Structures are given as C-alpha cells and as structure tokens.
C-alpha cells in the first residue's frame, strides 16, 4: 500500500447541479472542510508521516473537524437528498470518516490511513456521476510540499480540471517524471472522457503528445490504441436517454475483451461507465436494472489499468454487495473485490492482510452469499 501515495484526500467538490435552488448552502458546508483538508494533504500522501506518533494530535484534531463538518451535510433539506446517489455518497463518506477516526484513536493507524485513501476516490466519483456546473481555481489550498503528480490528483479531486490538465501536461514534458508517464496519460484521458467529453478535441491533444516523440514505446502504443477508441467515439451517434444502460453495458463488455495484445479498450470502458452513471443519475431504473448498473461499474473499473480509477472498483463492488445481498451480482462483486484486496496486500513476502480488513472481507462475504451458506458461529 505504501506505493499508492499519489491519491490525496479532499471532499470540497461534492456539489449539486446549478439548477437546484440554494446550492450555495451545500457549497458553504463544503467550505468548512478546506482547512482540515489542506492540513491533512501531506500526511495522507505519505503513510509513514500519517503513522508517526509526532503527528498524532494534529491528525486527530483534523479528523474531528472533518467528521463534524461533513456530518452537517446530513441535515441539508430533503430536496438535496432526493438527487440520485447524493444521500448515499454523503452517508458513505460520513461512515468512512467515522470508521477511520475510530480506528485511528484505537491506535490502528495503518488501517485508518488505508481507509482514508478512499476519500479522493469518492470525491471524483461524484464528479463523474453528477453534473458539476463549473470549474474553479483555488491554488492556495494546495500544499506546497506536493509534487506535480500529487498536485494534479488534488486538482482533479477539487474539480480544478483546467489547472489539472496544465499540471499533467507540464509533468509529461519533464524528463524527471518519465517513469510516471502512464499515470499522467491515464489521468489526462480520464479528464477527457469523463469531464470534457469532446472526442475530437481529445484526438487533437493526444496526437500532439505522440508527435513530441518523448513517450516510451509502450506508452506510445497505449496512446495509439486510445486514438482508435476516440476516433470511434467521434463517429458514434448520440445515445438516447432510455438506451444509456444498455449501450453502456455493450461498451463495457466490448472494452473488457482483451485483444491479441491483452489490452482492454480503455476508451470504451470509460465511455461505458459514463453512460451507466448517467442512467443511474436519471433515475427510473427498476431493481434489476439498478443492481446490474452498480455491478457493471464495479466490474468495469476492475478491468481498467492502475492509475485510472484506483479504488472505484472497490467502491461500487462493495455498494453492490451492501444494497443487493445474497444475489448473483453480489457474489460476482465479492469475488472481484476480495481478489483486489488480496492483491493489494500481497508482495514478494506473501500476503499480509491486516486483521481489520480480513474481518471486513468476512462481513462482505456473508452478505454476498447469505449467512445460511456458512457454518454457524460456535
């Protein structure tokens, strides 16, 4: 897990569409999170710093502030909670903060750090789901100690997409970050497919990157594959509202199919998940459709390479298990989820899964398969 320190925690960007009255109330609640988030940034980016006893009081104080201010969102008017997925997102993050804070106070700092890595995931997941009305810039809220990659992650999480693209492009031109080209390129594609959604503009940008001839051969081949996907997207007809789930499923299935080079179609997977998100946001799905949609998101994100949607697969797979226990989709979701977690904690010395995470896996397994399928407790 120590190699996954690029994600930075921030919740500022959970906003509602501008069409909803009094959106300023939600934004005002989010403003309270700025100070504790900025303080925690370098600590959440470095597990050693987070677990250092010298930082314990500081972390405790900021977690208390985050929990208090985020729980205030649970008291917003019903009209906000009626938005598809919003109340669920608030509840998930509130529970995450409660759990991480409790474990941290118990001295289980590594587990608390691991749990808090989900914060930026949940944040950008909301951006991918809801219609964010605008972008903005608030450079003062970025810690000076962050390197360009960490800075870009924070900018993406706080919906400062224009600045994020500039930061990522600059890092791509810097030879000292050549080892991170795959992360940078995937972050750029993520912005293009999930935020900008202009395949012609994206084609021009990535063709320009290829022309620079700075990319390693493997990365250049990856971008070449994206160009094909973007080209197909630019020629695809608009998808009707009622067909988004079905079209999204087709794209996900096609994107997950490995070709002769064993590569998934990243553009198709990202397009497909965008359509599934939109179908969930629109509402009107019956239980079977919603169950399929949530599972498809978890499955699709598990098929995407690392640094695209780190943690998104766990988010939706776990949601599928929690909302639809003892169903076929829940069982599929658990199998993917458990494999992912085991991979995260397996290295050259074997597997070393923390006890708390093992208990969490066991809880999910019982929900996915049903208590009756397990031996009774002694």
Regions found by a protein language model. Name each.
Residues 80, 126-129, 171-181, 209-236, ...:
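Short solvent-exposed coil/turn linkers within tandem alpha-helical repeat scaffolds
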Residues 143-150, 190-206, 227-244, 302-306, ...:
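Alpha-helical linker/edge segments of TPR/alpha-solenoid repeat scaffolds
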Residues 119-131:
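The canonical Cys-X-X-Cys-His
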